[in-house]
Regions:
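Hydrophobic alpha-helical transmembrane segments of membrane transport/permease proteins
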Residues: 4-5, 36, 40-79, 245-254
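Short helix-to-coil transition segments within interhelical loops
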Residues: 76-81, 118-120, 200-217, 260
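Glycine-rich helix-loop "coupling/hinge" segments at transmembrane-helix boundaries
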Residues: 147-151, 161, 231, 237-282, ...
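Transmembrane-helix boundary motif in ABC transporter permease subunits
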Residues: 47-51, 101-133, 145
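C-terminal transmembrane helix and the adjacent membrane-cytosol boundary/short C-terminal tail
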Residues: 152-163, 176, 225, 229-230, ...
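N-terminal signal-anchor/first transmembrane alpha helix
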Residues: 2-58, 128-131, 220
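Generic hydrophobic transmembrane alpha-helix motif, especially the helices
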Residues: 73, 118, 127-192, 223
C-alpha cells in the first residue's frame, strides 16, 4: 500500500515547482531581466556591511551637497551624508520590510483562504471571509495613522521584546495583505476541494488538514506566488510612501522614502542627485518585481503564453 504523503513531501513538491518556475522565468526575456535585477538588489542589500562604503550616518559637513564625483560617487545630501551608501543601506530596509510583510500576508491569507475554501458554505467560511472584508474595507494609510497615533514612532518595550517602528510597519502591512491573498486562495481552494482526488483522499481516511497541506496547497501555490511577487513591488512603494510622510522607517536608519522626503526642498534647486538616486532605486526595484510577476503570469497561463508567442510571431 502506498504511503500517504507527509508535510515534508508536500514541501518538497512545492520547492520542485518553484525550481521549475524559476527555470521557466529565465527563458522569458522580461522574467530574466527582472530576476537579474532582483538578485543584484538583494546582493547589494545583504552584502552592504561587507562593501567598502562610507558610513551612511556620518556627516561630512565640509562636503554638504557635493555633486557626484570621485570622492562621493552619488554625491552628498544637505547635511553631508554619502548618498551611495545610504541608497544601498536603504535597500536593506525596503527589501527586508517587503519580504517580511509579504511573507506574513501569504501565511495568514493562504491559511485563512484554505480553511474557508475547505469549509465552503459553513459558518466558518462566512466568519473568516466577512472578517477579511471588514479588514480590507479600511485603507492602509488610515490603519498606519491610527497605529502611529496609538503607539507612536518610538520603540515599544513589551516584556523582553523591543518592537521597533519597522516591526510595527511589517506587521501592519502583512496583516492588511491577508484579505486579498485570502480571497485569491479561497476561490482556488473552493474549486480544488471539489476535485475527485480530494474525495478519494477522504475515502482513504486522510484528515482535512493533511489534504489541504499535501494535496490542495501544492496545486494552488503558483497563482499565490504571482500575487506575492507583485505585492513585493507594491510594498516597496508603500514603505517609501509611509517613510516619506514620517510614518515608516525612522531616522537615522537609511530609507529610500525618508531620503526622498529630506530632498523635497532641493528638487528645484539644481541639486538633482539628492533625490534622483533614491527615486531611481524605488523605480528599479518596483520594475524588477513587476517584470517577474508579469513573466510568471505568462509562464503559468497557457493562454497568455500563446498570445505572447502569436504577438512575437506577428512582429517578425
Amino acid at each position: 500500500m502506498r504511503a500517504l504523503p507527509d508535510r515534508s513531501s508536500a514541501l518538497a513538491a512545492i520547492m520542485r515547482g518553484v525550481g521549475r518556475l524559476v527555470r521557466a522565468l529565465m527563458r522569458e526575456p522580461t522574467g530574466a531581466i527582472g530576476v537579474v535585477l532582483i538578485v543584484a538588489l538583494g546582493a547589494l542589500a545583504v552584502c552592504a556591511p561587507l562593501l567598502p562604503l562610507k558610513d551612511p550616518l556620518h556627516l561630512y559637513i565640509e562636503h554638504r551637497l557635493e555633486a557626484p564625483g570621485t570622492a562621493f560617487l552619488f554625491g552628498t545630501d544637505q547635511v553631508g551624508r554619502d548618498i551611495l551608501s545610504r541608497t544601498i543601506w536603504g535597500a536593506r530596509a525596503s527589501l527586508s520590510i517587503g519580504l517580511c510583510a509579504v511573507a506574513i500576508g501569504v501565511v495568514l491569507g493562504t491559511g485563512i483562504g484554505l480553511v474557508a475554501g475547505y469549509k465552503a458554505g459553513s459558518w466558518i467560511d462566512e466568519a473568516l471571509m466577512k472578517a477579511m472584508e471588514v479588514l480590507a474595507s479600511i485603507p492602509l494609510l488610515i490603519w498606519a495613522i491610527a497605529l502611529v497615533g496609538i503607539t507612536g514612532t518610538d520603540t515599544l518595550h513589551i516584556g523582553p521584546f523591543a518592537v521597533t517602528n519597522e516591526t510595527k510597519l511589517v506587521l501592519l502591512i502583512g496583516v492588511l495583505y491577508a484579505p486579498g491573498l485570502a480571497r485569491l486562495t479561497y476561490s482556488l481552494a473552493r474549486t480544488e476541494v471539489q476535485a475527485e482526488y480530494v474525495a478519494a483522499r477522504h475515502l482513504q481516511g486522510v484528515g482535512g488538514a493533511r489534504i489541504l497541506l499535501s494535496d490542495v496547497l501544492p496545486n494552488i501555490v503558483s497563482p499565490v506566488l504571482v500575487q506575492a511577487t507583485l505585492l513585493l513591488g507594491v510594498t516597496i512603494i508603500v514603505e517609501a510612501s509611509l517613510s516619506f510622510i514620517g510614518l515608516g522607517v525612522q531616522p537615522p536608519t537609511p530609507s529610500w522614502g525618508a531620503m526622498l522626503s529630506d530632498s523635497r526642498a532641493l528638487i528645484f534647486t539644481g541639486d538633482w542627485w539628492v533625490s534622483i538616486f533614491p527615486g531611481a532605486a524605488v523605480f528599479v526595484s518596483v520594475l524588477a518585481f513587476n517584470l517577474v510577476g508579469d513573466a510568471m503570469r505568462t509562464v503559468l497561463d497557457p493562454r497568455r503564453r500563446q498570445r505572447a508567442a502569436e504577438t512575437a510571431g506577428g512582429a517578425v
